Amino acid sequence: MLELNRLYNMDCMEGMKMIDDNSIDMIFTDPPYGHNNNNNGDLISRREAALGKGEYVPDRDNRAIMNDGKEADEIFKQMIPEMHRVLKAGCCCCCCCGGGPDPMFARWSLWLDEVFKFKQMIVWDKGPMGMGWHYRRSYETVLVAMKKGAACKWYDETHAIENIIRPRYKGIRKIIPSKAQHPTQKPVELAKFFIVLHSQEGETVLDPFAGSGTTLIAAKQMKRQYIGFELDKQWADIATARLEEAKNQTTLF
């Protein structure tokens, strides 16, 4: 078993092989899903966006995401059996899946249900999107599936949890792109929302696609153990720095 409370700068397919069967209590992850890419899998310029070739992302040359092109589907499909293997029975796998014209959520839901028991598609309402044209992306999805063999691990029996996460009452806000360190960075509070529902203090949370470390920070702040993998050294270094900052903030209080 790998050492806990660490981010590993390596391919998650290789790293997962070093995790014992039935040893993880919860997975929350944001895999590459082709967000903001053109047909070549490249983040595109403002001019290309204006010509209808995709959605503009600032600083594209420094913010590219590995394996975020057409290969994203295949990578996710290959990961499903490994995520299932390491999870304990009754535990949940929560996967962010974007929101947009590509019905990726439909494909991924069906693939998850072939191995897990598909539980729900959660809609994260990101609030008003401002000025624009055509359909604006005001939501993203999170797919929740559980490993069969035991009752679903659910740790909030006092509230009816809607399948729409609305920012006005959950305290979860959309990250302003210019302030994000990763092009698809999620709010720490979003990860906390799922971590608290599907795990307890001291249990282990896994993020195979850690990016800039949001899931790991949320796990740390909620007193969970964690393991994360990130292939790209650029993002792994940023995640490590964010984790160290979170650790220092914790010791202040």
Tell me what each language-model feature is:
Residues 1-229, 234-237:
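Core catalytic lobe of class I
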Residues 1-2, 240-253:
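Short, conserved SAM-binding/catalytic segment
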